[in-house]
Amino acid sequence: MQKTYTNSYLFKRFLPYYGKYYPTLILDLICAGFSTMCDLVLPIILRYLTNTARQDLSLLTVKLILTLGVIFVLLRVVDTIANYYMQNIGHVMGAQIETDMRYDIFSHIQQLPYSYYNTNKSGQILSRITTDLFDVTEFAHHCPEEFFIAVVKLVVSFVILININITLTLTIFIMIPIMVFFMSSTNNHMRKAQKEQRNHVGEINSGIENNILGAKVVKSFANEELEVKKFHKENLRFLDIKREFYKHMSNFQVVYRIFDGIMYLTVIVLGSYYMKVGKINAGDMFLYTLYINMLLNTVKKIVDYMEQFQRGMTGIERFIEIMDVKNDIVDKENAKVLTDVSGDIEFENVSFAYPDSDAKVLDDISFSINKGENIAIVGSSGVGKTTISNLIPRFYEVTEGAILIDGTDIRDIKQKSLRDNIGIVQQEVYLFSGTIYENIVYGKKNASFEDVEKAAKMAGAYDFIMELPDKFDTYIGERGTKLSGGQKQRISIARVFLKNPPILILDEATSALDNNSEAIVQQSLEILSKGRTTITIAHRLSTIRNASKILVLTENGIEESGTHEELMNKEGIYFNLYNKNIDELKE
C-alpha cells in the first residue's frame, strides 16, 4: 500500500467521479465566474471615480454616483446568489462524490480475498473508508472552484492591467510563476507529511480498536497503565508527524509572505515612479494596488485551503491504493453455478503456501469425502487443519493440485454459488451488532420468521431466546457481548441451519466452550450434520468418536486414516493424540 502516485495520475483517477455531476459542476463554475467578475468590476468603478474626481469634481454628479451605486448593488445581488449556490449546492456535490467513492471502496473491499484482511490492520482499512474520504467533500468542491477563480482573476486582471502599463504589469506577473514554483516544492513535502499522518491515524485506530475489544484482557492483567503508555507513545509520534507537516506549511507561508512583500514593493516603487513621469495616473495606481491585493488574497486563500487540499489529495491517494489492490481469486468467464449438490469432495495432490511465504503449509495432500459422510481432521497445531477448511470455500487459492466438489474443480465454480452451498461454524463466533433475529436471518435473507424460529429450535437456542426480555428482538451488543459463549455458538449454528447447505465445515466449533455448553452445542451440531457432508476440525478428540472417518494430519501429510476404533487399535499417532487429549481434559 505504499506506492507513490503523481498528482496528475491522482487527478486522472479522480475526475471520473465528477461524471454524473458535470451539470452541477459547470453551474458552480459559472457562479464562481460571476462572483469573480463582480469582484473585478469594483476596482474599475473606483478607478473611474478617482480619475473623474481628479480631472473635474463637477463631473461627479448625483446621477453618476447613483448609477454607480445601483451597479454596485446589482453586482452584490448577483454575487450573493452565486455564492449561495456555490456554498450550498457545490458542497452537496462534494458530499455526493464522497458518498460514491465510499460505496465503491466498500464494494471493492467486499470482493477482496480473505488474505487481504489477514495482512492489513482493520484500523487502517476503517480509516481509509471513513476518515480519509471526509476531506474529499471539501476537495471535490473547492479544488475546481478555487482553481477556476484564480485563473479568471489572473487572466482578466492581466488583460486589464496590460492595457494600462505593459512594463509594470509584466514585472508583477512574472513573479507569479516563480512564486508557484517555490510553493509547489514545499507543497510536495506537505503531501508526504500528510500521507504519513494519515497512515499513523490508521495505526492509532488499530491500537484503540485492539484496546477496546481486548478490554477484559487488559483489566484481567491490570495492564491499564501499560496500555496508556503504549497509546501515549503513538500519540506523541502523531504529534511529531504533525510538527513536520506544520514546519513545511510554515515554509509555504514564508514563500507567500516574501512574494507578497516583493509584489507590493514593486507597485509602490515602480508605480510611484511611473506616476511621477506621467505613464500612469492616480486612478491607475489605485487599480494596480487593488488588483495586486486581490491576486494576493486569491493566492492566500489557496494557501489557507492548502492543508485541506493536501488532506483531500491524501485521501484520494489512499483511496486509490486500495482500489488498485487486485483480487487474486476471481471467477472464470465460464464459471458454473452449482445445482443439486450431492456433497462429494475430493482433494487431488493439493499443496498450499500463503502468498507472503514460500513454506508449504500443505504438501501433496489427497483424500476424498463421499456424499453425507462425516470426516474429522485431527493433528497438532500448525499442520494445516484450518487451512484445509479455508481452501474448500476458496478463501485461499491452492498453490498446486485441485479441490473438486461433485467432480467439478472449485476454480470452475462461481464463488457465490460455491459458498452458498457451504456452511461454516467456527471456534471464534462472530455476531453482528443488532438483534438475535437479525443475526440468525443473516443466513438466509428471504427467510420467514417461522423459518428463523425453526432454525433456533433445531440449534437448541429457542429456549434461552424466549427467556430474554425482548426474545428474538433482543439487542446482543457488539459482537454478541451480552450473550454467553455457548449462546453465541448456538446462534451461529441456527444461522447455518437456516442456510441449510449440503456441505458443512466445523472448525473447532466447541473448543472454546465449557463442558456444559459444549454438550449442548455438540448435540446441536450432531443434528445439523445429519444428511450433510461434514468436515470437522477437532481439538477435543472426544467429540469426533462417531465420525465416519478420521484423517490424522502431520507435517508429512495424512499419515493415518480410519474410524476411531481402527485408529485406536493401531496405537499410532491418533492413539497418542487421543490419550494425551483425554489426560489434559482430566487435569
What do the predicted segments below correspond to?
Residues 23, 114-115, 131-140, 144, ...:
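An intracellular "coupling" helix at the cytosolic face of ABC transporter transmembrane type-1 domains
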Residues 30, 38-42, 82, 130-175, ...:
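Hydrophobic alpha-helical transmembrane segments of ABC transporter permease domains
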Residues 9-10, 18, 86, 90-94, ...:
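Juxtamembrane loop-to-helix connectors within ABC transporter transmembrane domains
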Residues 2-4, 95, 102-127, 131-133, ...:
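Short intracellular "coupling" helices and adjacent cytoplasmic loop segments at the cytosolic face
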Residues 332, 338-587:
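ABC-type nucleotide-binding domain
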Residues 30-31, 75-94, 145-152, 173-197, ...:
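Alpha-helical transmembrane segments of multi-pass membrane proteins
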Residues 25-82, 162-167, 278-282:
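Transmembrane helix-loop-helix hairpins at lipid-water interfaces of multipass membrane proteins
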Residues 55-61, 66-67, 160-174, 248-317, ...:
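Helix-loop-helix
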